[in-house]
Protein backbone atom coordinates (compact mmCIF):
# COMPACT_ATOMS: atom_id res chain seq x y z
CA UNK A 1 0.00 0.00 0.00
CA UNK A 2 2.82 2.37 0.95
CA UNK A 3 4.63 1.59 -2.31
CA UNK A 4 1.47 2.35 -4.27
CA UNK A 5 1.05 5.71 -2.54
CA UNK A 6 4.67 6.61 -3.26
CA UNK A 7 4.28 5.71 -6.94
CA UNK A 8 1.08 7.74 -7.22
CA UNK A 9 2.73 10.74 -5.55
CA UNK A 10 5.75 10.56 -7.87
CA UNK A 11 3.47 10.29 -10.88
CA UNK A 12 1.54 13.39 -9.84
CA UNK A 13 4.77 15.31 -9.32
CA UNK A 14 6.02 14.34 -12.77
CA UNK A 15 2.72 15.38 -14.35
CA UNK A 16 2.84 18.70 -12.48
CA UNK A 17 6.41 19.33 -13.62
CA UNK A 18 5.53 18.51 -17.22
CA UNK A 19 2.57 20.90 -17.12
CA UNK A 20 4.74 23.66 -15.67
CA UNK A 21 7.32 23.14 -18.40
CA UNK A 22 4.66 23.15 -21.09
CA UNK A 23 3.27 26.45 -19.77
CA UNK A 24 6.59 28.29 -20.05
CA UNK A 25 6.24 30.97 -22.70
CA UNK A 26 9.05 31.07 -25.24
CA UNK A 27 10.51 34.32 -26.60
CA UNK A 28 12.56 34.85 -29.73
CA UNK A 29 15.93 36.57 -29.57
CA UNK A 30 14.43 39.40 -31.65
CA UNK A 31 11.73 39.95 -29.02
CA UNK A 32 14.24 39.97 -26.18
CA UNK A 33 16.55 42.39 -27.99
CA UNK A 34 13.64 44.75 -28.71
CA UNK A 35 12.82 45.32 -25.03
CA UNK A 36 12.99 48.97 -23.98
CA UNK A 37 15.27 50.12 -21.20
CA UNK A 38 14.20 52.81 -18.73
CA UNK A 39 15.94 54.64 -15.88
CA UNK A 40 15.75 57.63 -13.56
CA UNK A 41 12.15 58.07 -12.44
CA UNK A 42 11.75 61.44 -10.65
CA UNK A 43 8.58 63.03 -9.27
CA UNK A 44 7.76 66.71 -9.50
CA UNK A 45 7.52 68.55 -6.18
CA UNK A 46 3.71 68.32 -6.18
CA UNK A 47 3.93 64.63 -7.20
CA UNK A 48 1.65 65.24 -10.18
CA UNK A 49 4.25 64.41 -12.81
CA UNK A 50 7.06 61.93 -13.35
CA UNK A 51 10.03 62.12 -15.69
CA UNK A 52 12.21 59.23 -16.75
CA UNK A 53 14.63 58.18 -19.48
CA UNK A 54 13.90 55.48 -22.04
CA UNK A 55 15.45 54.18 -25.25
CA UNK A 56 12.05 53.38 -26.80
CA UNK A 57 12.88 55.88 -29.58
CA UNK A 58 16.08 53.98 -30.37
CA UNK A 59 18.22 56.10 -28.05
CA UNK A 60 17.67 57.42 -24.52
CA UNK A 61 15.36 60.45 -24.40
CA UNK A 62 13.36 62.16 -21.66
CA UNK A 63 9.68 61.35 -21.15
CA UNK A 64 7.12 62.91 -18.83
CA UNK A 65 4.02 61.24 -17.43
CA UNK A 66 1.01 63.17 -16.12
CA UNK A 67 0.07 61.06 -13.10
CA UNK A 68 -3.49 62.40 -13.04
CA UNK A 69 -4.32 61.46 -16.62
CA UNK A 70 -1.59 58.84 -17.28
CA UNK A 71 -0.77 60.72 -20.46
CA UNK A 72 2.86 60.60 -21.57
CA UNK A 73 4.81 63.04 -23.72
CA UNK A 74 8.34 62.88 -25.11
CA UNK A 75 10.25 65.97 -23.96
CA UNK A 76 13.43 65.50 -26.01
CA UNK A 77 14.03 64.11 -29.48
CA UNK A 78 17.73 63.30 -29.61
CA UNK A 79 18.95 61.18 -32.51
CA UNK A 80 22.62 60.85 -31.48
CA UNK A 81 23.26 61.55 -27.77
CA UNK A 82 21.60 59.72 -24.89
CA UNK A 83 19.68 62.01 -22.51
CA UNK A 84 19.29 60.97 -18.86
CA UNK A 85 16.81 62.64 -16.51
CA UNK A 86 18.14 64.07 -13.23
CA UNK A 87 14.91 65.48 -11.81
CA UNK A 88 12.80 68.61 -11.68
CA UNK A 89 13.83 71.96 -10.28
CA UNK A 90 11.84 72.12 -7.02
CA UNK A 91 11.47 75.89 -7.49
CA UNK A 92 10.62 76.32 -11.18
CA UNK A 93 9.50 72.81 -12.11
CA UNK A 94 11.93 72.78 -15.03
CA UNK A 95 13.52 69.51 -16.12
CA UNK A 96 17.19 68.80 -15.43
CA UNK A 97 19.04 66.17 -17.46
CA UNK A 98 22.56 65.07 -18.38
CA UNK A 99 24.11 64.11 -21.70
CA UNK A 100 27.52 63.76 -23.29
CA UNK A 101 28.49 64.77 -26.83
CA UNK A 102 29.03 62.13 -29.45
CA UNK A 103 29.67 59.43 -26.87
CA UNK A 104 32.76 61.14 -25.42
CA UNK A 105 31.55 60.32 -21.87
CA UNK A 106 31.99 63.97 -20.82
CA UNK A 107 28.50 64.48 -19.42
CA UNK A 108 27.11 68.00 -19.11
CA UNK A 109 24.12 69.19 -17.07
CA UNK A 110 21.21 70.79 -18.92
CA UNK A 111 17.98 72.55 -18.05
CA UNK A 112 14.94 72.69 -20.32
CA UNK A 113 13.74 76.30 -20.25
CA UNK A 114 11.00 77.63 -22.52
CA UNK A 115 11.26 74.52 -24.66
CA UNK A 116 15.01 74.86 -25.22
CA UNK A 117 17.93 72.98 -23.67
CA UNK A 118 20.55 75.15 -21.94
CA UNK A 119 23.98 73.75 -21.11
CA UNK A 120 24.73 74.70 -17.49
CA UNK A 121 28.25 73.25 -17.56
CA UNK A 122 29.80 74.31 -20.89
CA UNK A 123 33.34 73.51 -21.98
CA UNK A 124 34.75 71.11 -24.57
CA UNK A 125 36.54 68.91 -22.02
CA UNK A 126 34.20 69.57 -19.10
CA UNK A 127 32.71 66.61 -17.27
CA UNK A 128 29.95 67.33 -14.76
CA UNK A 129 27.41 65.55 -12.59
CA UNK A 130 24.35 66.59 -10.62
CA UNK A 131 24.91 66.73 -6.82
CA UNK A 132 21.57 67.86 -5.40
CA UNK A 133 19.90 71.07 -4.24
CA UNK A 134 20.61 73.66 -1.58
CA UNK A 135 18.38 73.70 1.49
CA UNK A 136 16.30 76.62 0.15
CA UNK A 137 16.00 74.82 -3.22
CA UNK A 138 17.08 77.95 -5.09
CA UNK A 139 20.46 76.61 -6.20
CA UNK A 140 21.67 73.36 -7.70
CA UNK A 141 24.91 71.63 -6.73
CA UNK A 142 27.09 70.40 -9.57
CA UNK A 143 30.45 68.61 -9.55
CA UNK A 144 32.66 69.68 -12.46
CA UNK A 145 36.26 69.52 -13.68
CA UNK A 146 35.89 72.75 -15.68
CA UNK A 147 38.74 74.52 -13.83
CA UNK A 148 41.20 71.64 -14.02
CA UNK A 149 40.57 68.38 -15.94
CA UNK A 150 42.38 66.44 -13.18
CA UNK A 151 40.09 67.46 -10.32
CA UNK A 152 36.38 67.83 -9.64
CA UNK A 153 35.28 71.01 -7.85
CA UNK A 154 31.89 71.70 -6.30
CA UNK A 155 29.74 74.52 -7.70
CA UNK A 156 26.25 75.78 -7.06
CA UNK A 157 24.11 77.26 -9.82
CA UNK A 158 21.35 79.81 -9.23
CA UNK A 159 18.31 78.20 -10.83
CA UNK A 160 16.83 81.59 -11.84
CA UNK A 161 19.86 83.47 -13.19
CA UNK A 162 21.87 80.32 -14.01
CA UNK A 163 24.99 81.99 -12.60
CA UNK A 164 27.47 79.61 -10.96
CA UNK A 165 29.65 79.95 -7.86
CA UNK A 166 32.45 77.69 -6.65
CA UNK A 167 31.78 76.13 -3.25
CA UNK A 168 34.85 73.91 -2.91
CA UNK A 169 38.13 74.05 -4.84
CA UNK A 170 39.54 70.55 -5.06
CA UNK A 171 43.31 70.56 -5.58
CA UNK A 172 44.05 67.28 -3.78
CA UNK A 173 42.02 64.76 -5.76
CA UNK A 174 39.31 64.26 -3.14
CA UNK A 175 36.12 62.40 -3.90
CA UNK A 176 33.05 64.45 -2.96
CA UNK A 177 30.71 62.25 -0.92
CA UNK A 178 27.82 64.31 0.41
CA UNK A 179 26.79 67.72 1.69
CA UNK A 180 24.82 68.42 4.85
CA UNK A 181 21.15 69.37 4.77
CA UNK A 182 21.99 72.89 6.00
CA UNK A 183 24.69 73.32 3.32
CA UNK A 184 27.40 73.93 5.94
CA UNK A 185 29.45 70.74 5.71
CA UNK A 186 30.94 68.74 2.87
CA UNK A 187 32.28 65.21 3.29
CA UNK A 188 35.41 64.30 1.31
CA UNK A 189 37.17 60.98 0.85
CA UNK A 190 40.67 60.13 -0.34
CA UNK A 191 41.73 56.71 -1.60
CA UNK A 192 45.30 55.88 -0.57
CA UNK A 193 45.23 52.15 -1.33
CA UNK A 194 42.86 49.17 -1.42
CA UNK A 195 43.23 48.88 2.35
CA UNK A 196 43.11 52.54 3.34
CA UNK A 197 40.58 55.24 2.55
CA UNK A 198 40.48 58.49 4.50
CA UNK A 199 37.40 60.57 5.33
CA UNK A 200 37.28 64.33 5.97
CA UNK A 201 34.68 66.86 7.08
CA UNK A 202 34.99 70.27 5.38
CA UNK A 203 33.33 73.37 6.87
CA UNK A 204 32.06 75.46 3.95
CA UNK A 205 31.76 78.59 6.10
CA UNK A 206 35.27 78.61 7.58
CA UNK A 207 37.07 76.68 4.80
CA UNK A 208 38.51 74.39 7.46
CA UNK A 209 38.50 70.60 7.48
CA UNK A 210 39.01 67.86 10.04
CA UNK A 211 39.79 64.19 9.50
CA UNK A 212 37.14 61.71 10.59
CA UNK A 213 39.29 58.67 9.83
CA UNK A 214 41.72 58.59 12.75
CA UNK A 215 43.03 55.07 12.02
CA UNK A 216 44.67 53.32 9.05
CA UNK A 217 41.69 51.47 7.56
CA UNK A 218 38.89 51.86 5.05
CA UNK A 219 36.37 54.56 5.94
CA UNK A 220 33.28 54.98 3.78
CA UNK A 221 30.92 57.95 4.15
CA UNK A 222 27.15 57.38 4.37
CA UNK A 223 25.04 60.42 5.28
CA UNK A 224 24.09 63.12 7.78
CA UNK A 225 21.18 62.75 10.16
CA UNK A 226 18.13 64.94 9.60
CA UNK A 227 19.28 67.67 12.00
CA UNK A 228 22.93 67.64 10.85
CA UNK A 229 24.10 66.78 14.34
CA UNK A 230 25.88 63.55 13.38
CA UNK A 231 27.51 62.07 10.32
CA UNK A 232 27.31 58.32 9.77
CA UNK A 233 30.06 56.29 8.17
CA UNK A 234 31.28 52.70 7.99
CA UNK A 235 34.75 51.33 8.65
CA UNK A 236 36.53 48.01 8.85
CA UNK A 237 39.12 49.17 11.38
CA UNK A 238 40.31 46.24 13.51
CA UNK A 239 37.55 44.06 12.05
CA UNK A 240 36.96 41.59 9.25
CA UNK A 241 33.66 43.29 8.48
CA UNK A 242 32.40 46.86 8.09
CA UNK A 243 30.40 48.39 10.93
CA UNK A 244 28.49 51.64 11.36
CA UNK A 245 29.92 54.60 13.28
CA UNK A 246 28.86 58.21 13.85
CA UNK A 247 30.81 61.44 14.09
CA UNK A 248 29.29 64.22 16.19
CA UNK A 249 29.50 67.57 14.44
Can you name each region flagged by the protein language model?
Residues 35-53, 80-98, 109, 124-143, ...:
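Conserved beta-propeller blade repeats
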Residues 103, 148-149, 161, 193, ...:
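Short flexible coil/turn linkers enriched for glycine and charged/polar residues
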Residues 15-16:
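C-terminal motif of bacterial Sec signal peptides marking the signal peptidase cleavage site
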Residues 2-8:
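Sec-dependent signal peptide recognition
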Residues 66-70, 112-116, 158-162, 203-207, ...:
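Short loop/turn segments that connect beta-strands within beta-propeller blades
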Residues 51-77:
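Beta-propeller domains
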Residues 103, 117, 125, 149-150:
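Preference for long, solvent-exposed alpha-helical segments and helix-linker "stalks"
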Residues 27-33, 71-77, 116-122, 163-168, ...:
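A short beta-strand motif characteristic of beta-propeller blades
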Amino acid sequence: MKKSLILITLSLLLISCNRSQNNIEQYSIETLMSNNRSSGGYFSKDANKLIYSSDKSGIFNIYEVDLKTNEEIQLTDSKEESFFSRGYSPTTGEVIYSADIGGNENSHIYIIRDGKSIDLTPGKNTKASFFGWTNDELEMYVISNYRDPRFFDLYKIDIITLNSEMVFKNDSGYNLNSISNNDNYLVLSLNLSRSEQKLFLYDVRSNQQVEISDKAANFSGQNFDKNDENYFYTTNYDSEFYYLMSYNL
